[in-house]
UniProtKB/Swiss-Prot annotation:
It comes from the Bacteria. SUPFAM superfamilies: RL5-like. HAMAP family: Ribosomal_uL5_B (MF_01333_B). This is Large ribosomal subunit protein uL5. Keywords: Ribonucleoprotein, Ribosomal protein, RNA-binding, rRNA-binding, tRNA-binding. The gene is rplE. Belongs to the universal ribosomal protein uL5 family. GO terms for molecular function: rRNA binding; structural constituent of ribosome; tRNA binding. One of its GO terms (biological process) is translation. It holds the Pfam family Ribosomal_L5.
Amino acid sequence: MSRLREQYENEIKDAMIKKFGYKNAMEIPKLDKIVVNMGVGEAKENAKVLEAAVKDMEAITGQKAVTTKAKNAIANFKIREGMPIGCKVTLRGEKMYEFADRLINLALPRVRDFRGVNPNAFDGRGNYALGIKEQIIFPEIEYDKVDKVRGMDIIFVTTAKTDEEARELLAQFNMPFAK
């Protein structure tokens, strides 16, 4: 069992019950999944760029990445329907907790001029979205082998009903929110 999962089972559940007064154990919010998405706009000119992005994504998450395709054509961006334009990974279970642990304790502190993540990036339904400007903050990525610095979106999907509950859950996981 991963460190964050153990922390959730032993400490966080009790703290959440104390704070919000849940009567049923199933009411306690938990991390449902983490979706990591990387939009690669240059993929329309060069397919090798997308391959490199997929390789980086797989190294970071430890799971096979799925290429995302354009849903509809956008003439201004020279994109046709069905063109590969990015990649994503959906993490659940143990891999999700392992990734969250690495992100919170290893990767985020390596961001330049890091003052904490935005505490207001919740969507109103208890999900948290986080944007990262460069993939080189992860220890799995070798700096010398990176062809181009790319950003990614990380979405924490929780079973929380409100943003306040989700914020407390992530704060219990030691998510470094900006003050």
